[in-house]
Design a protein with these regions (language model features):
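Alpha/beta-hydrolase
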Residues: 2-100
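Alpha-helical elements of Rossmann-like donor-binding domains used by nucleotide-donor carbohydrate transfer enzymes
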Residues: 28, 47, 81, 127, ...
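Conserved alpha/beta-hydrolase "acid-adjacent" motif
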Residues: 93, 118-124
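Short, conserved loop/helix-junction motifs that constitute active-site signature segments
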Residues: 102-106, 131-132
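Short beta-strand/loop motif that positions the catalytic acidic residue
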Residues: 104-105, 111-113, 117
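Active-site-adjacent alpha-helix of alpha/beta-hydrolase-fold enzymes
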Residues: 122-136
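Catalytic active-site module of serine/aspartate enzymes centered on a nucleophile-bearing elbow/loop
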Residues: 135-168
Length: 168
Protein backbone atom coordinates (compact mmCIF):
# COMPACT_ATOMS: atom_id res chain seq x y z
CA UNK A 1 0.00 0.00 0.00
CA UNK A 2 2.81 2.40 0.79
CA UNK A 3 4.13 2.07 -2.78
CA UNK A 4 0.75 3.11 -4.19
CA UNK A 5 0.14 5.84 -1.63
CA UNK A 6 3.58 7.33 -1.02
CA UNK A 7 2.35 10.73 0.20
CA UNK A 8 -0.07 9.24 2.71
CA UNK A 9 2.56 6.74 3.87
CA UNK A 10 5.16 9.48 4.30
CA UNK A 11 2.80 11.56 6.45
CA UNK A 12 2.09 8.51 8.61
CA UNK A 13 5.58 7.04 8.74
CA UNK A 14 7.42 10.28 9.59
CA UNK A 15 6.18 10.12 13.13
CA UNK A 16 5.07 6.55 13.68
CA UNK A 17 6.53 3.97 11.37
CA UNK A 18 10.13 5.01 10.88
CA UNK A 19 11.96 1.82 9.96
CA UNK A 20 9.41 -0.40 11.70
CA UNK A 21 7.37 -2.81 9.62
CA UNK A 22 4.70 -5.41 10.14
CA UNK A 23 4.38 -6.78 13.64
CA UNK A 24 7.01 -4.44 15.08
CA UNK A 25 5.05 -1.42 13.82
CA UNK A 26 1.75 -2.81 15.09
CA UNK A 27 3.22 -3.38 18.57
CA UNK A 28 4.63 0.16 18.61
CA UNK A 29 1.26 1.66 17.67
CA UNK A 30 -0.62 -0.57 20.09
CA UNK A 31 1.57 0.50 23.01
CA UNK A 32 0.90 4.14 22.10
CA UNK A 33 -2.83 3.48 22.00
CA UNK A 34 -2.85 1.74 25.39
CA UNK A 35 -0.51 4.12 27.20
CA UNK A 36 -1.49 6.62 29.87
CA UNK A 37 -0.52 9.68 27.79
CA UNK A 38 -3.89 10.73 26.37
CA UNK A 39 -2.33 13.18 23.91
CA UNK A 40 -0.09 10.44 22.48
CA UNK A 41 -3.07 8.07 22.28
CA UNK A 42 -5.00 10.71 20.33
CA UNK A 43 -2.05 11.38 17.99
CA UNK A 44 -1.57 7.68 17.23
CA UNK A 45 -5.30 7.14 16.67
CA UNK A 46 -5.56 10.14 14.32
CA UNK A 47 -2.47 9.11 12.36
CA UNK A 48 -3.65 5.50 12.04
CA UNK A 49 -7.13 6.66 11.05
CA UNK A 50 -5.78 8.85 8.24
CA UNK A 51 -3.47 6.12 6.92
CA UNK A 52 -6.03 3.32 7.08
CA UNK A 53 -8.67 5.55 5.47
CA UNK A 54 -6.30 6.26 2.58
CA UNK A 55 -5.71 2.52 2.13
CA UNK A 56 -9.28 1.21 2.35
CA UNK A 57 -10.64 4.08 0.29
CA UNK A 58 -7.96 3.79 -2.42
CA UNK A 59 -10.57 2.90 -5.04
CA UNK A 60 -12.63 6.00 -4.33
CA UNK A 61 -12.22 9.12 -6.45
CA UNK A 62 -10.51 11.05 -3.69
CA UNK A 63 -8.78 10.42 -0.41
CA UNK A 64 -10.81 11.40 2.66
CA UNK A 65 -9.55 14.73 3.98
CA UNK A 66 -9.13 13.75 7.60
CA UNK A 67 -9.63 10.03 7.60
CA UNK A 68 -12.78 8.24 8.64
CA UNK A 69 -12.46 9.24 12.23
CA UNK A 70 -15.72 10.86 13.18
CA UNK A 71 -15.20 11.57 16.86
CA UNK A 72 -11.87 10.98 18.58
CA UNK A 73 -13.11 8.24 20.92
CA UNK A 74 -14.40 6.24 17.94
CA UNK A 75 -11.01 6.58 16.23
CA UNK A 76 -9.20 5.45 19.39
CA UNK A 77 -11.52 2.47 19.84
CA UNK A 78 -11.23 1.45 16.19
CA UNK A 79 -7.43 1.76 16.22
CA UNK A 80 -7.16 -0.26 19.45
CA UNK A 81 -9.29 -3.05 17.99
CA UNK A 82 -7.34 -3.07 14.71
CA UNK A 83 -3.97 -3.11 16.49
CA UNK A 84 -5.16 -5.81 18.93
CA UNK A 85 -5.88 -8.05 15.96
CA UNK A 86 -2.64 -7.07 14.21
CA UNK A 87 -0.35 -7.80 17.19
CA UNK A 88 -2.06 -11.19 17.54
CA UNK A 89 -1.63 -12.04 13.84
CA UNK A 90 -5.40 -11.74 13.43
CA UNK A 91 -5.78 -14.91 15.53
CA UNK A 92 -5.10 -17.10 12.51
CA UNK A 93 -1.94 -18.66 11.18
CA UNK A 94 -0.62 -17.72 7.76
CA UNK A 95 -2.54 -19.56 4.99
CA UNK A 96 -4.71 -21.36 7.55
CA UNK A 97 -7.80 -21.38 5.34
CA UNK A 98 -5.93 -22.59 2.26
CA UNK A 99 -4.07 -25.21 4.30
CA UNK A 100 -7.35 -26.57 5.73
CA UNK A 101 -9.66 -26.12 2.73
CA UNK A 102 -10.31 -29.87 2.56
CA UNK A 103 -12.13 -29.60 5.90
CA UNK A 104 -14.62 -27.07 4.56
CA UNK A 105 -18.03 -28.33 3.41
CA UNK A 106 -18.80 -28.43 -0.28
CA UNK A 107 -21.18 -25.51 -0.76
CA UNK A 108 -21.77 -23.09 -3.63
CA UNK A 109 -19.15 -20.35 -3.29
CA UNK A 110 -18.94 -17.00 -5.06
CA UNK A 111 -15.73 -15.06 -4.48
CA UNK A 112 -16.04 -11.37 -5.29
CA UNK A 113 -12.98 -9.18 -5.05
CA UNK A 114 -12.28 -5.52 -5.66
CA UNK A 115 -9.58 -5.08 -8.26
CA UNK A 116 -8.33 -1.95 -6.48
CA UNK A 117 -8.32 -3.54 -3.03
CA UNK A 118 -4.85 -2.88 -1.66
CA UNK A 119 -5.70 -4.18 1.81
CA UNK A 120 -6.42 -7.73 0.63
CA UNK A 121 -4.97 -8.22 -2.82
CA UNK A 122 -7.05 -9.99 -5.50
CA UNK A 123 -4.39 -12.69 -5.65
CA UNK A 124 -5.71 -14.03 -2.33
CA UNK A 125 -9.21 -14.41 -3.78
CA UNK A 126 -7.79 -16.17 -6.83
CA UNK A 127 -5.86 -18.64 -4.68
CA UNK A 128 -9.01 -19.37 -2.70
CA UNK A 129 -11.00 -19.84 -5.92
CA UNK A 130 -8.45 -22.35 -7.23
CA UNK A 131 -8.68 -24.30 -3.97
CA UNK A 132 -12.51 -24.47 -3.83
CA UNK A 133 -13.91 -26.83 -6.44
CA UNK A 134 -16.84 -25.30 -8.32
CA UNK A 135 -16.37 -21.79 -6.94
CA UNK A 136 -16.78 -18.68 -9.06
CA UNK A 137 -14.35 -15.77 -8.98
CA UNK A 138 -15.11 -12.23 -10.07
CA UNK A 139 -12.81 -9.23 -9.89
CA UNK A 140 -14.55 -5.88 -9.97
CA UNK A 141 -12.04 -3.66 -11.75
CA UNK A 142 -12.89 -0.44 -9.97
CA UNK A 143 -13.98 -2.00 -6.68
CA UNK A 144 -11.91 -1.62 -3.56
CA UNK A 145 -11.91 -3.14 -0.09
CA UNK A 146 -15.21 -1.95 1.37
CA UNK A 147 -18.37 -3.98 0.85
CA UNK A 148 -20.33 -0.73 1.11
CA UNK A 149 -18.92 0.49 -2.21
CA UNK A 150 -21.75 0.47 -4.74
CA UNK A 151 -20.08 -1.90 -7.22
CA UNK A 152 -19.26 -4.42 -4.48
CA UNK A 153 -22.67 -4.12 -2.84
CA UNK A 154 -24.43 -4.75 -6.16
CA UNK A 155 -22.23 -7.78 -6.92
CA UNK A 156 -22.78 -9.23 -3.44
CA UNK A 157 -26.54 -8.84 -3.78
CA UNK A 158 -26.49 -10.53 -7.21
CA UNK A 159 -24.41 -13.40 -5.80
CA UNK A 160 -26.75 -13.77 -2.82
CA UNK A 161 -29.80 -13.77 -5.09
CA UNK A 162 -28.09 -16.39 -7.27
CA UNK A 163 -27.44 -18.59 -4.23
CA UNK A 164 -31.04 -18.20 -3.08
CA UNK A 165 -32.27 -19.38 -6.51
CA UNK A 166 -29.83 -22.31 -6.51
CA UNK A 167 -30.90 -23.45 -3.06
CA UNK A 168 -34.66 -22.90 -3.51
Amino acid sequence: AQRLLPQSWERFSKEYAGHRKGLELAKHLYSGLLGTDQEETARVAKAWDSWSAAVVMFSMNSEPAGGMMGDLQTAISRARIEMHYAVNSYFIEENHILNHISQFPSVPTHIIHGGRDITCLPEAGWQLHKAIVGSTFKVLRTGGHLSGEKELTDALIRATDNLAEMLA
